[in-house]
UniProtKB/Swiss-Prot annotation:
Belongs to the conotoxin M superfamily. The cysteine framework is III (CC-C-C-CC). GO terms for molecular function: acetylcholine receptor inhibitor activity; ion channel regulator activity; toxin activity. One of its GO terms (cellular component) is host cell postsynaptic membrane. It comes from Conus purpurascens. Expressed by the venom duct. Keywords: Acetylcholine receptor inhibiting toxin, Amidation, Disulfide bond, Hydroxylation, Ion channel impairing toxin, Neurotoxin, Postsynaptic neurotoxin, Secreted, Toxin. The modification Lysine amide is found at K24. Disulfide bonds join C4-C16, C5-C21, C10-C22. This is Psi-conotoxin PIIIF. The modification 4-hydroxyproline is found at P2, P3, P14. Psi-conotoxins act on postsynaptic membranes, and act as non-competitive antagonist of nicotinic acetylcholine receptors (nAChR). Is less toxic than Psi-conotoxin PIIIE. It is found in: Secreted. It comes from the Eukaryota.
Amino acid sequence: GPPCCLYGSCRPFPGCYNALCCRK
């Protein structure tokens, strides 16, 4: 599936959300 994080921002996908992605 697609990565949870793209371009340094929080990008949730269906069934793939990681709060750690929100870190800069």
